[in-house]
Amino acid sequence: MEIHHQLLVSLLFLLLPLCSSQENTRSLAIDVNGPVETSPISEKLNPKLVYEIKVHGFMLWAAMGVLMPIGIISIRLMSIKDQPIITLRRLFFLHVTSQMVAVILVTIGAVMSVINFNNSFSNHHQQLGIGLYVIVWFQALLGFLRPPREEKARRKWFVGHWILGTSIAILGIINIYTGLHAYAKKTSKSANLWTILFTAQLSCIALVYLFQDKWSYIQSQATFNRNQSVDHNSNISTAETGHGYEVEESKPELEKC
């Protein structure tokens, strides 16, 4: 009887590790198949997913952080007066091309997000991203439906196009910051360097944007100062020439004396 009791106790001790290992395995499976927020360890151990996140972020940065500002600045440069027609055409072509490439990159980034990432739309980055994607495509279609200048609808179209473009620029910048935060949260890697670099880039873009409004004034002032200096030099040369004539006219009188 005691032997049977000892065998039963030994079997219990042998079965306990097996039960605990099965429980750990099942908990790991639940963690892997669970939401992204509750299992960051599985994502950190997946280099392919980290690479896809980086590609997604780079494409959206190129679209919203580079091409969209280029399109805005190029179209604003067209408002400078007295520009050659060829310059205006090049600026308009730059505006259209940059915006079309930006729309393509946004679309590819959105498709990558749907296919590769867990899109539960439970965080601000995903929610803002889907809304931004819809606005970007609506703005692109609105750009192709531009009415002629002589039509009355052109003014309403311009106001709507400007409002949508400004909204896309602001929301795109915000979504880049939220994307950097989401990247740091998912991969447990610091995104402070990228945040600082993007902030510095935004500061440079803002300076260029504010400076271009004053560029025409600076050019007009430079032209005015140059004309003034030319007039001043011509007046001095005229005065010196007149003074030379007076000296030569006074020479015969001095010789008579």
From Swiss-Prot:
Record's Gene Ontology CC terms? membrane
Residues that bind heme b 2:
H95, H161
Transmembrane domains' residue ranges: 55-75, 91-111, 125-145, 157-177, 191-211
The answer on whether this UniProt entry bears the keyword Ribonucleoprotein reads: no
Which keywords label this protein? Answer: Electron transport, Heme, Iron, Membrane, Metal-binding, Signal, Transmembrane, Transmembrane helix, Transport
Q: Which PROSITE patterns match?
A: CYTOCHROME_B561
**Residues annotated for heme b 1 binding in this entry:** H56, H125
* GO terms, molecular function: metal ion binding; transmembrane monodehydroascorbate reductase activity
Q: Where is the composition biased (Basic and acidic residues)?
A: 243-257
Q: Give the cofactor binding note.
A: Binds 2 heme b groups non-covalently.
The record's section on InterPro entries has: CYB561D1/2, Cyt_b561/ferric_Rdtase_TM
- Please give the cofactor(s) recorded in the UniProt entry for this protein: heme b
Q: What is this protein called?
A: Cytochrome b561 domain-containing protein At2g30890
Q: What is the lineage of its organism?
A: Eukaryota, Viridiplantae, Streptophyta, Embryophyta, Tracheophyta
